[in-house]
Amino acid sequence: MDVMMQFSRERLEQDASFSAIYVVYHGFQSWICIFAPVLTALPVLAVKLSETESGLTRFVSVRLNHKKKLTGVCNFYLLAGATVLVTGFLLFCLITFAFFPSLNRYSVDSVYQINSQLYPDGSMIGTAYHKGGAPAAFLLYLSGLFLYGISCNAIILFCSSLSNNMYVITCLPFFFHYSCERISTLLSINLAENTSKTIHRIVNALNPNAFVHSFLYPVDHFWIWTYHSVRTALCIIAFIAICKRRSRYDFLI
């Protein structure tokens, strides 16, 4: 929106970096660390608020001792949060394509240059683009975004087992993501050049944006996916353990 207010349509059509598809991929990822924890928390907040207003909080807490109920709640929170994130991205795409020029309006050289930046060789999205074109690359990115939503919502899932307070459920995951992003960035800057590549890769994997970047750029996927998988699994295990304990001793914040 700020770009649209500062530049005319003619100015936007002179620079291919203002093309809609470029803004979609590189504009959204710069804000994903901020918006992902908030968007993925919406289904959890909706359920918690409905439980509080209906006065069924303690009843639900007791039912969470049932294995099927607990599994259903866990799956709903994870999948619903990821779906909200993908839906938010699709709305962003619609707005972007409505206000920014199509890539086809630029010269052949500009299109080639932008495509080489959007779909670099050796990246997952680049491989998908060369095999199935732009639709395949876009679907791959949506899949990665969905998985990232599950990873983000796992932390929210854990926080929801500790408290029913909406500020705790929203702010703690946001603080965690922002802190990890800042710590990873500072460590990456201050690491000496003679530090082993493995340490560099581990530090980079701590960055919340690294998971999305693993689909867009030719990076080492092992440490990034391992970190997010382990983090998600630990959050789910902690959620199940805490909810079972809550159902027995009935403590709520």
Each language-model region and where it sits:
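Central hydrophobic cores of alpha-helical transmembrane segments
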Residues: 166-180
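Junction motif at the cytosolic side of a transmembrane helix
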Residues: 158-162, 229-253
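Residue-level recognition of pore/gate-forming positions within transmembrane alpha-helices
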Residues: 77, 174-178, 232
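Transmembrane helix-loop junctions in multipass membrane proteins, especially transporters and channels
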Residues: 93-108, 165, 189-196, 243-252
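Amphipathic cytosolic juxtamembrane alpha-helices at the membrane-cytosol interface
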Residues: 64-78
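Transmembrane helix boundary and interhelical loop/hinge segments in multi-pass membrane proteins
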Residues: 44-62, 66
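Membrane-helix interface segments
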Residues: 65-67, 149, 165-169
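Secretory targeting signals
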Residues: 2-51, 75-153, 157, 161, ...
